[in-house]
């Protein structure tokens, strides 16, 4: 028709293809933008770990074990079940044993944490080795921390009391008797050290 610009079939197909391509690219981009989760809230916490003070920026959803392993590099604490049942992640929080997979990092703000790395020179570790307590070793750090809490709170614990205190720590290698023997050996070592300290202390003369 006169006065009207004719569009060739080739130009029509080229234009249609470009429009379809642009729409196809735009849809995933819009979907990605819509699906992007909002940034998780973060909190600054002050925490003392094995006697060293730390300031951490943590997401409010992080667990204590995540903060220890992924952000402080303390990988001695293990993640086992990750649901507060096996005890592999046990640490001491203000001296009390807790499952660090079930504790939010923000709950530790202003508090003191001890991990297995803090027991490097503890006689309890030597007793565990001497009595072949670790087998595969995965649960050992949690077993150590529960045993440490027991001997700190009750140095004269009986075997039955030790068994009860360790009940929250699962050992898939069934090395329970070895762990109890190691605890008894550590108790004996503590008593000997206490006796030696008393013997070497200068006597007071009135």
Go through the PLM ranges and name each one.
Residues 2-206:
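Signature of N-terminal electron-transfer/Fe-S-associated modules in redox systems
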